[in-house]
From Swiss-Prot:
Catalytic activity, as annotated: Release of an N-terminal amino acid, Xaa-|-Yaa-, in which Xaa is preferably Leu, but may be other amino acids including Pro although not Arg or Lys, and Yaa may be Pro. Amino acid amides and methyl esters are also readily hydrolyzed, but rates on arylamides are exceedingly low; Release of an N-terminal amino acid, preferentially leucine, but not glutamic or aspartic acids
Name of protein: Probable cytosol aminopeptidase
The family this protein is said to belong to: Belongs to the peptidase M17 family.
Residues at the catalytic site: K282, R356
Predominant subcellular localization, coarse grouping: cytoplasm
Superkingdom as given in the UniProt entry: Bacteria
Main function: Presumably involved in the processing and regular turnover of intracellular proteins. Catalyzes the removal of unsubstituted N-terminal amino acids from various peptides.
Cofactor(s) annotated in UniProt: Mn(2+)
Length: 503
């Protein structure tokens, strides 16, 4: 689908369709008022007859409106004008895309980007419109034999901006929006792929393909079990012992700043391509969704794709920590004591708390890059789902400025996170009689104690942890990966690169 921006009057648009908003109760938006004036009150007369109230999601498609060059006008309800916030704006865009697609409009000029959204500028409105449009049109049908396609799918969308001054920021918004949307799609595709296809080797192949596509400044190295053993990554290796699929760690290095002083930002993604729970096996109900336990790695892959596509002037390293947690004769057990790459020992009390055992060794491994900051992304704890539900990602950090940056990026992008504490009191729950620490700390504050566990391996750099257990996928009828927190991390890196979306 093609996107562009222009600045022009609605009555002069030669297009298959013009999209304008109507507020509740039956109040025309400024652009709709212009069209109504040109058409001698044609639109307001329809509203007076009760054809459209302006409630969110309502639509009315008009054909051959007098004195308007466009073939059709799509009126879309935007709710009450004062209540139009970012969430409602995205819903309106989503409804617009679905309606245009369902009614066979192959192209349209959208004036919704001229609506006032509280606290948001032109760049944000255009970028979010692009991201929302791509999200709305997403489907995962690679493995279906019968693929359904719209009769005449929407191919071109033009976003109108108030004046020519906004064209540059609008074009930049489209560029950024498309790159972020492509990263989200890549993350969703990886997450939705079944575990018999998407194993650690598959993750590694995707990482290698990324380097092939952006060979100018992307290098991928894949570290297998033998090399991990030589590095002393015994905790990581233990988790994958029960699986016939080899554990593989894929390291994607993007260099956008050649300066010797430019330290990288490192992103670490948990890549459990299937988590049965191991010997501490999970209940069978819902276990199919444990293919989503690699959504952290999928998100990191999507972000690296976005960074490479935009050629950001920063250095970023993405690590996909791929493995599979299965029961078996070689599987690790409750009661085992593991020696991590850092030299610290861990008593395993539950083999289903495996993500932290993989991540702790990767967090030690990345010390060699002397990072500016390290952010790990993981579907780590069910406790985070209980704490924050399915709408907000959990955030923990050992560095306040980094945490504040991530919270700001989450607000800018609409991919929200909430900070949880990392207090010494919680560390006490990880005490073990037989090792330096246990891998679980009991039910109270489970998301926090998981973060506390990881914090013991991050003392040499600024670090943040994103627990996406509640936000990485949806269940039920809408089952599928969400691609979060690609948008959050993309905004964080855009801000670091100097593109903060301010006009």
């Amino acid at each position: 689908m093609e996107f562009s921006v222009k600045s022009g009057s609605p009555e002069k648009q030669r297009s298959a369709c013009i999209v304008v908003g109507v507020f509740e109760p039956r109040r025309l938006s400024p652009i709709a008022e212009q069209l109504d004036k040109i058409s001698d009150g044609y639109i307001s007369a329809l509203l007076r007859r009760g054809e459209l109230e302006g409630k969110p999601g309502q639509t009315l498609l008009l054909h051959h409106v007098p004195n308007v060059l466009s073939e059709r006008i799509l009126l879309i309800g935007c709710g009450k004008e004062r209540e139009l916030d970012e969430r409602q704006y995205k819903q309106v865009i989503q409804k617009t895309i679905n309606t245009l697609n369902d009614t066979g409009s192959m192209e349209a000029v959208c004036f919704l980007t001229e609506l006032h959204v509280k606290g948001r500028n032109n760049y944000w409105k255009v970028r979010q419109a692009v991201e929302t449009a791509k999200e709305t049109l997403y489907s995962f049908d690679q493995l279906k034999t019968n693929k359904s396609e719209p009769r005449r799918p929407l191919r071109k969308m033009v976003f109108n901006v108030p004046t020519r001054r906004e064209l540059t920021s609008g074009e930049r918004a489209i560029l950024h929006g498309l790159a972020i949307a492509a990263g989200i799609k890549a993350a969703k595709d990886l997450g939705n792929m079944p575990p018999n296809i998407c194993n650690a080797a598959y993750l590694a192949s995707q990482a290698r393909q990324l380097a092939d596509s952006y060979s100018k400044n992307v290098i991928t190295r894949v570290i297998g079990e033998q090399q991990m053993k030589e590095l002393g990554m015994h905790s990581y290796l233990a988790v994958g012992q029960g699986s016939q699929n080899e554990s593989l760690m894929s390291v994607i290095e993007y260099k956008g700043n050649a300066s010797e002083d430019a330290r990288p930002i490192v992103l670490v993604g948990k890549g459990l391509t299937f988590d049965s729970g191991g010997i501490s096996i999970k209940p069978s109900e819902g276990m199919d969704e444990m293919k989503y336990d690699m959504c952290g790695a999928a998100a990191v892959y999507g972000v690296m794709r976005m960074v490479a596509e935009l050629q950001l002037p920063i250095n970023v390293i993405g690590v996909l920590a791929g493995c599979e947690n299965m029961p078996g004769g070689r599987a690790y057990r409750p009661g085992d004591v593991l020696t991590t790459m850092s030299g610290q020992t861990v008593e395993v009390l539950n083999t289903d708390a495996e993500g932290r055992l993989v991540l702790c060794d990767v967090l030690t491994y990345v010390e060699r890059f002397e990072p500016e900051a390290v952010i790990d992304v993981a579907t780590l704890t069910g406790a985070c789902v209980i704490a924050l539900g399915h709408h907000i990602t959990g955030l923990m950090a050992n560095h306040n400025p980094l945490a504040h940056e991530l919270i700001a990026a989450s607000e800018q992008s609409g991919d929200r996170a909430w900070r949880l504490p990392l207090g010494d009191e919680y560390q006490e729950q990880l005490e073990s009689n037989f090792a330096d620490m246990a891998n679980i700390g009991g039910r109270p504050g489970g998301a926090i104690t998981a973060g506390c566990f990881l914090s013991r391996f991050t003392r040499k750099y600024n670090w943040a942890h994103l627990d996406i257990a509640g936000t990485a996928w949806r269940s039920g009828k809408a089952k599928g990966a969400t691609g979060r927190p690609v948008a959050l991390l993309a905004q964080f890196l855009l801000n670091r690169a100097g593109f903060n979306g301010e006009e």
